[in-house]
Amino acid sequence: MPRCERALPSRSIATMPAVFATGFLVGFLEWACLLVVKPHLDWPAEQTVGTHVDVSHEAATPPGLVVTARAKLVGVDGRKLRFEVEADDGIDLIARGTHERVVILRERFDAKVAEKAAAGSDPGRGGA
């Protein structure tokens, strides 16, 4: 399987159309979900992380338009939160879908990430 070893976009990204990119749109929708639940969490000890995204990017948005993201919490199953999301640019509905997040204890989460990072930097481990 090919590996992506670039941390920054290549020059080929510069040839992409000048529109609001899908990856940035998904991040913006995630942020809207966070704003919905943050007041109900013991922040910063409790936080949420995204676990699933099912979003259709339906229309291009050129520079200069204002994008508005909306998120509605539609389901809670233990620590799992399910949202309906959408975004518009004042002209078109540009995205709609669902997003799932899980409530985490930040300290515990950070400890697991640090453990994984240490294991990944072990030269005897091999890596992916």
Regions found by a protein language model. Give the residues of each.
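Generic structural detector for well-ordered beta-strands
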Residues: 1-3, 56, 98-102
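Hydrophobic beta-strand-centered segment that forms part of the acyl-chain substrate-binding groove
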Residues: 33-68
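HotDog/MaoC-like acyl-thioester-processing domains
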Residues: 62-63, 72-128
